[in-house]
Amino acid sequence: MNIKDLQEKIEAVWENRHLLSDEATMKAIDAIIDLLDRGELRVATPSDKGWQVHEWVKKAVILYFPFRKMETKEVGIFEYYDKIPLKHNYEDKGVRVVPPATARRGAYLAPGVVLMPSYVNIGAYVDSGTMVDTWATVGSCAQVGKNVHISGGVGIGGVLEPLQAAPVVIEDGAFLGSRSIIVEGVRVKPVEYKGYVPARSVVIPGSYTKQFPAGAYQVPCALIIGQRKASTDLKTSLNEALRDFNVAV
């Protein structure tokens, strides 16, 4: 099937779930997950008009769960019990993975990606040179650009439900500070101001005053305190030694 055929198949199954048991449906969904896994298909793609979300691809990911059966997976001394297979062949993909980091099938990891003990969910796209640091989570369908540093404990939200939600987009060169939480629909880019953060911004937790019927209250927000300077870049520069697979760290 070509992409157009796959899209039409998914839209038909989405409207009629009885088709889920059809062998052709299973093959179509599996083909889409395989394309996502190889980075040949994405849940969202950049264009001249901004980011375009492909809802039918998100639908395919959701439909992948019902026809998958729970099964035990043994990885060395560890045991998992889940529906979604794990990614494998990291050496061939040029991806460095530190135990016990986990990435599900259907997530794309480009050559040069480094996973410290972290988690990457199905539908996510992580581009080259990006490091996902310890205990960080890249949620379902999140789109992460090149040379991004996702610091320890960062949570990037997933967006399989509600279906209309736009995925988190982290564009090239961003540095996400430790324990940041980035939720669905937020775009961190190479410039907001509502829903996305301007390029080279320095952001801290803040609040603003919002008027409610009961009075004025402080509401949490991302507070932009300035732009990155040379000194900021020096402090947050990517350590190439950590990205050289032949260097012991």
Give residue ranges: language-model regions.
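Terminal amphipathic alpha-helical/low-complexity segments used for targeting or macromolecular assembly
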Residues: M1-V95, R200, G206-V249
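Structural signal for interior beta-strand "rungs" in well-ordered beta-sheet cores
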Residues: E91, V95-F212, I224
